[in-house]
Amino acid sequence: MIRNPRLRNREQANNRHLIDPYPVHTLKRVDQPTTRINEAEVFRQHEQTSGFYRAGRGDFGEHMQQEYRRFVPKYPLSGAMVSMAGALADLVDEPVGMGAAGMPDSAVPKNMSWAPMGQVAEKKAPFTDNPEKMARHIKETAYFLRADLVGICELPVYAIYSHQKQDGKPIHLNHKYAIAILIDQDWHTSRQTSGNDWISNSMSFLAYSTSGFIACMLADYIRRLGYPARAHHAMNYQVAVPPILLWAGLGEMCRIGDIVLNPFLGPRFKAAIVTTDLPLAIDKPIDFGLQDFCAKCKKCATECPSGSISDKDKVMYHGYEKWPVDVDKCTKMRIGNKQGSGCGVCIKVCPWNKPNTLFHRSISWTMRKLPFARRFGVWGDDLLGYGKPDYNHKWWLDLETINGDLQVPNSSKNR
Ligand code: SF4
């Protein structure tokens, strides 16, 4: 088993022209995402319509409003991660009126010689006008910063939120390109968890905070090359992530509602985005047979503890043809979970949630290429016991902060 998800595979090591850690060059590329999108019907969403925002506002009652404030920090590790992610909230774009190292202009010493932090450089850097070379360079830079997968697309206008969550102000974003950065939530931990125990939120925030950290640095780097760029991460989005992932060739929409599923990571990742005007060659959407696979599998719908995921057919919703999901039920489950912190059972049980080993890459290839094998794939997944927690290797501590005290919860699997 490859424990380090960042280890590049042997194929890449032997082919220096391959820059991606996963064999994305083997995927079938298509002109349109496999999810039908009726662009005339897609409207730009107000970010305050999200389930979590509504919970924090009190739309689901006082108890949920209180739980919303503690459902991540009630577990000490996810609390540490959300603090770090929060520190990145104001580092997404060039600071207004700030100088070097984030100091106010008035406080910057006159003899300071380096470029002010985060500003778009006045002169464009040499060698930045070739879109093919720059796309390759930006991907290599993101991988150097420890991204797991990267894709690039033109930014669809309908992916831009209409209004900000923080202050409700209208969003004016006119960047041409979007760079999507995926971070794996860790297979080693995913194998052990039930999906809704005490490590669940930490897996999410590992990927939220890391992808946000990389996006903020990448956006700052691009601004230093002389082009506008803004990072978008869990603590400060101006764009909806799923349509960008579809167009950037990083996955297909799956049965788990608005979730995009990647052929190498499954749904076990979180993403951050950089939008920019730096000229970049774009990727194309991918088709690995997921629409057919999800139509047959339905494992997430069966296992979802809140019954939020439908086992029925797709419907047209806000211009997307997708499987419906009950966002309110899902939000209440994740916030109100008394047996753990958060919930990701759908991610845990998905047959595409596998390690990057030769055996699993072979199975994945078969599922992608041979439609008749897909039913056997779901059956074999159950037979081999994937989807069940493996607490024999559990590494984390079960703890819950209650009224300021750390306690061992009744649901603890500590051994
Ligand atoms: Fe699709 Fe099955 Fe994964 Fe659900 S569990 S997203 S139906 S492949």
Residue ranges and their predicted role:
Residues I2-Q32, K312-R415:
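Flanking helices and flexible, charged tails adjoining ferredoxin-like Fe-S electron-transfer domains
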Residues N130, M134, S209, F213-I214, ...:
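Intrinsic-disorder/low-complexity, polar/charged segments
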Residues Y75, V82, I244, H360, ...:
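Low-complexity, intrinsically disordered regions enriched in charged/polar residues
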Residues K139, F144-N356, H360-M367:
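Catalytic cores of enzyme domains
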Residues M1-S190, G195-D197:
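Non-catalytic, usually N-terminal nucleic-acid engagement modules in DNA/RNA processing proteins
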